[in-house]
Amino acid sequence: MTDAPIISPLDQARILSEALPHMQRYDEETIVIKYGGHAMGAEDDAKAFARDIVLLEQTAVNPVVVHGGGPQIATMLKRLGIKSEFAAGLRITDGATIEIVEMVLAGSINKQLVGYINEAGGKAVGLCGKDGNMVTASKATRTMVDPDSRIEEVVDLGFVGEPEKVDLTLLNQLIGHELIPVLAPLATSSSGQTFNVNADTFAGAVAGALKAKRLLLLTDVPGVLDQTKKLIPELSIKDARKLIADGTISGGMIPKVETCIYALEQGVEGVVILDGKVPHAVLLELFTNQGTGTLIHK
């Protein structure tokens, strides 16, 4: 490991001076941050992320964290000998799997992240969409084309849900008391059934309901790439739809961008897809002139 570069006091002052107008821009604004399971990395990385979240709160930003946990769920399922299958990019979640998903997301990752934020001096509260009926969902459906018959078939994803309604009562109370909500992407149906919700989709629904200033989707790629694999720094909704249509945006990036478009249409001012493995990615995006990742806007 190499030593960090030495920054002179003057350079430190310049960095703070550059950050000031950005801090003023986000003063008292709500920022929803989706922290993906792949972006979590090692414990030191998670603790650094937690410190950055506390810094946001100290600068009068209202951060709301939604975390994923795909790799951690996969590890636990393998340890328990439970096979896991995917369809249309979503984990098929049967009765045994949903219990493990809830245990890992709400019982392990959520509380660990809450602990890191509190250790850094923040006041985080760990919840999932089931708490206070915050997020109500319905069963998700996807269609896939059978490779042999070429017939489109409906895929049963089990207990995978799509958000239908977000009740802001609990979130607004937490934000109003300067507490940091940390949300696991689990929801409940009107009949009380627990659903596993894609973390990007969950974050988009929450951000849209809150009319957040920004939604940040931290993932394991730099952002949206063009056909030469170079980062596209900024896109309008119209541009994004064109890139989906011509195949530039493909695979797992399509649902992420669709989540961005949904959030923007619900009133979020801007959405950024960025690499969560980059140190201090959230601060780089919000508090520097250059930013990082791909900004999608109306």
Swiss-Prot record:
Gene Ontology biological-process entries: arginine biosynthetic process via ornithine; L-arginine biosynthetic process
Localization (cell): Cytoplasm
Site (Transition state stabilizer): 34, 256
Amino acids binding substrate: 69-70, 91, 196
Enzyme Commission number: 2.7.2.8
Reactions accelerated catalytically: N-acetyl-L-glutamate + ATP = N-acetyl-L-glutamyl 5-phosphate + ADP
Primary enzyme class: transferase
Function recorded in the entry: Catalyzes the ATP-dependent phosphorylation of N-acetyl-L-glutamate.
Family stated for the protein in its record: Belongs to the acetylglutamate kinase family. ArgB subfamily.
Protein name: Acetylglutamate kinase
Gene designation: argB
